[in-house]
Structure formats: structure tokens, C-alpha cells
């Protein structure tokens, strides 16, 4: 099994403005619209393969509600050759840290059936 790199919610801000990183919210579009981390794009967990649109040179930073779905998605994307980091504790830990939040929308279109 490939090791999955994790980062803390407080370390997430270090990646927000990096041109080599993409922050991905794996929650549902409804959850994303209520609140999400600034600069994050929404690719629901069920559509994680839509991440193939990103260059393998990018670091994909994944978060979900509590951190478990992002670990599963990180494992899949790592197998596909991506550099991936999963946020421990998900958005719940990020909220608890009183860090940046946004209600701006930036959703990636996926081929949903």
C-alpha cells in the first residue's frame, strides 16, 4: 500500500496561494455552497477521477468533512501518479482553527449522470 502524506488543517494555509497546488473540496456541492476553504474547487468524492484534468506536476490537497474520504481519494490519486496530501480531520478541524473561510463558488464541472 502506498503511503499517503497528510497535513494538518493549520498547515493548509501554506498551500492556498501556491501556483503548484490545487485545494480540492470532496464534499457534496450543497455542502460546498454553504462554506468552503478559500481557493478550493469542488470535486465531489464520487467524481474524484475528474482530478485527472490537473497536471501531475501539481500538488493536490484534498479535504472532506472529517478526513476519511480524503484519505481514500488520496490513495486512488496516488496510484494514478499524483502528488497528494490529505487534510487530517477535514474541514471540521479547519473551522475549529478559526482560519480563512469563504462562500465564493468555484466548482469544477464533471460528467455526472
Question: How should each PLM-predicted stretch be described?
Answer:
Residues 63-64:
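Short, surface-exposed ligand- or partner-binding patches at beta-edge/loop junctions that are enriched
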Residues 1-22, 29-59, 68-113:
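Rhodanese-like catalytic fold shared by cysteine-dependent sulfurtransferases
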Amino acid at each position: 500500500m502506498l503511503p499517503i502524506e497528510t497535513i494538518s488543517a493549520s498547515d493548509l494555509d501554506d498551500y492556498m496561494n501556491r501556483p503548484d497546488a490545487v485545494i480540492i473540496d470532496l464534499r457534496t456541492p450543497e455542502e460546498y455552497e454553504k462554506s468552503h476553504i478559500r481557493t478550493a474547487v469542488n470535486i465531489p468524492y464520487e467524481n474524484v477521477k475528474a482530478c485527472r484534468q490537473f497536471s501531475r506536476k501539481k500538488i493536490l490537497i484534498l479535504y472532506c468533512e472529517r478526513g476519511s474520504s480524503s484519505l481514500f481519494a488520496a490513495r486512488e490519486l496516488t496510484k494514478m501518479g499524483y502528488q497528494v496530501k490529505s487534510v487530517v480531520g477535514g474541514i471540521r478541524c479547519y473551522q475549529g482553527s478559526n482560519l480563512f473561510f469563504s462562500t465564493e463558488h468555484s466548482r469544477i464541472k464533471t460528467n455526472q449522470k
